[in-house]
Structure formats: structure tokens, C-alpha cells
Amino acid sequence: MFEYLKGIVAKIDPAYVVLDVNGIGYKILCPTPYSYQENQPATIYVEQVVRDTGITLYGFLSLEDKELFLKLLSVSGIGPKSAVAIMAAEDTDSLASAIQNGEVKYLTRFPGVGKKTASQIVLDLKGKLGDYVKKSAVATDLTPSLQDALLALVALGYTQKEVDRITPKLAKLPENTADGYIKEALALLLKK
């Protein structure tokens, strides 16, 4: 019903924000409520979910995040609260990359996601997030030292899937030497 709401952020809670739109306060459950600032204007992309227990608004920073939420909802066994919890636990680029690469073990890290549900997520969504993953990869401009580090990781025996999953995180770090990137990459890879 709603695509987005524009207004002033009236309140921020760990699970939701209250957005004042022309004097009406909308409670919107968000995976990342602290991305907004109180008493500041905001546009929140929303999805209205109607259940027997009530009507709930779920909000997102971007239209792409909202689309990822809807795709997670299409998976058997994933409800709106689980989808928000999954999106809150990890940045969406890494999440989309893990699904695209079929990393079931990685997906079991999320709250309420066991091996069966993780397998179902991969089964239902693998191949359907290509545009989302490509957008994040194209937006990432890799420095020569980062490219060298990624090649070294593959030479060390890590799979291309594992390297692709951590590449967006490494690209967001301050520019470093190849050795510095390798140390950061190993810390991320061993953190599984």
C-alpha cells in the first residue's frame, strides 16, 4: 500500500523509529534504526504487513533493502520479524553475496536460522539476487593493493566464493598495503 514515508524522525528505539508525517506518528520496525537521526527529516521505504495480530510497518533505508526484505519473506519459514533480524545482523551486500554463493553455513549465523532454513533461503533465492550483488560489486572500486591481496588469498587456498563475500568489507576499509588487506581478510575469514 505504501511505498515510502517522508517526515521527521520523532523517536529512535533499538527496534523501531517513530516518523512524524504531518502530525501523525508512524511506528516503523527497522533493521537499522540508528541509521536515522532524531529530529531530522528522513525518507523511509516501507512495507505494510497485515497479520491476525495487527498491521505492522517495516522500514528500510533504500528501495534495494526493501526488495531484499520482500525476497526473504518469499522464503518458506521466514516471517517479517526473522527477515528484519537477518538484515539487522549483517550488511545487505554480504548477505546477498552469501545467498548468491550458496553459503548455507554462513547463513546459519543469523538469529532463528537453522541449517534447514538456510538451505531453503539458498534454494529459493539463489540466482534471484544477481542484480543486487552486481550493483554492490560495481559500486566497489578496488585499489591495486586490494586486488593483489585478493589474488593472494585465492593462492593461499581460499575459494573465490569466500573471497567475493569479504571483498565489499575490505573495499570499505581505509586504503592499505596488500599485506594489511591480507591481515584484515584473514581476520574476517576466520571470524565465520
UniProtKB/Swiss-Prot annotation:
Residues 1-61 are annotated as: Domain I. GO terms for molecular function: ATP binding; four-way junction DNA binding; four-way junction helicase activity. It is found in: Cytoplasm. Residues 141-192 are annotated as: Domain III. Residues 137-140 are annotated as: Flexible linker. InterPro entries: DNA_helicase_Holl-junc_RuvA_I (IPR013849), Hlx-hairpin-Hlx_DNA-bd_motif (IPR003583), NA-bd_OB-fold (IPR012340), RuvA (IPR000085), RuvA_2-like (IPR010994), RuvA_C (IPR011114), RuvA_C_sf (IPR036267). Residues 62-137 are annotated as: Domain II. GO terms for cellular component: cytoplasm; Holliday junction helicase complex; Holliday junction resolvase complex. It comes from the Bacteria. Disulfide bonds: none annotated. CDD domains: UBA_RuvA_C. It holds the Pfam family RuvA_C. One of its GO terms (biological process) is DNA recombination. Gene3D superfamilies: 5' to 3' exonuclease, C-terminal subdomain, DNA helicase RuvA subunit, C-terminal domain, Nucleic acid-binding proteins. Its main location: cytoplasm. Keywords: Cytoplasm, DNA damage, DNA recombination, DNA repair, DNA-binding. Belongs to the RuvA family. The RuvA-RuvB-RuvC complex processes Holliday junction (HJ) DNA during genetic recombination and DNA repair, while the RuvA-RuvB complex plays an important role in the rescue of blocked DNA replication forks via replication fork reversal (RFR). RuvA specifically binds to HJ cruciform DNA, conferring on it an open structure. The RuvB hexamer acts as an ATP-dependent pump, pulling dsDNA into and through the RuvAB complex. HJ branch migration allows RuvC to scan DNA until it finds its consensus sequence, where it cleaves and resolves the cruciform DNA. Has three domains with a flexible linker between the domains II and III and assumes an 'L' shape. Domain III is highly mobile and contacts RuvB. Homotetramer. Forms an RuvA(8)-RuvB(12)-Holliday junction (HJ) complex. HJ DNA is sandwiched between 2 RuvA tetramers; dsDNA enters through RuvA and exits via RuvB. An RuvB hexamer assembles on each DNA strand where it exits the tetramer. Each RuvB hexamer is contacted by two RuvA subunits (via domain III) on 2 adjacent RuvB subunits; this complex drives branch migration. In the full resolvosome a probable DNA-RuvA(4)-RuvB(12)-RuvC(2) complex forms which resolves the HJ. This is Holliday junction branch migration complex subunit RuvA. The lineage of its organism: Bacteria, Bacillati, Bacillota, Bacilli, Lactobacillales. The gene is ruvA.
